Design a protein with these regions (language model features):
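Positively charged
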Residues: 1-198
Length: 198
């Protein structure tokens, strides 16, 4: 018997099979890999599954409420980062900035490898990036504003450059001291709370 469908909304599309991957663990702040330039990702290497790597990076970014994370921030020697928000992340394999604006902006940044540290970093306002997607296909995208900044910070990270290296020693020292002070105050307040509860 033949069934006539008058409305395509009546058709139930097959459920998408989305592989579930565990997030990575973040590399310690003093990990050697954070200061290393990561070599080109080889799509032909049999044990490197781009989908798994990209998916795990996305899960890690989501877990830490981050707009972007590079693989070496998770202790992995893959030249890839992901950037995005909610369900809209892009994996950038072997990324390279091919064009940047002369106009710059100076705004606060932080990153998962230096949690709590907030620094005003000067960067180009827009960039054009060439990279390979999950299938190894070459792509070129242009970014402005916050997304351009996230992309630049992640590419820096893959080149062994932390955002703290983009400011003067004086600025970094002041910010580090301010953070240390906040941490000590937080610990003191939490110690007091624990003591009172006993």
């Amino acid at each position: 018997m033949q069934e006539i469908v008058y409305n395509t909304n009546e058709l139930n599309p097959p459920a998408k099979i989305v592989p579930e991957f565990e997030p990575y663990t973040l590399a310690p702040q003093d990990a050697e890999i954070l200061g290393s330039k990561i070599q080109i990702f080889d799509f032909g290497y049999p044990n490197h599954d781009p989908l798994e790597i990209g998916s795990r990076l996305v899960e890690t970014a989501k877990l830490h409420n981050s707009f972007g994370i590079a693989a070496n921030q998770c202790g992995e020697r893959y030249r890839v980062f992901v950037a995005g928000a909610d369900e809209n992340y892009i994996a950038f394999f072997n990324p390279e900035i091919i064009l940047e604006s002369e106009e710059t902006s100076l705004i606060p940044e932080t990153d998962l490898s230096n949690m709590g540290l907030l620094l005003h970093v000067k960067r180009p306002k827009s960039v054009t990036v060439q990279f390979q997607d999950l299938n190894g296909q070459l792509q070129t995208l242009h970014f402005d504003g916050l997304t351009a900044r996230i992309v630049q910070q992640c590419i820096d990270r893959l080149n062994g450059i932390g955002f703290e290296m983009r400011v003067s020693k004086l600025v970094l020292d002041r910010a580090t001291k301010a953070l240390d002070k906040k941490v000590k105050k937080f610990v003191k307040q939490n110690t007091y709370i624990k003591t009172v509860r006993k």
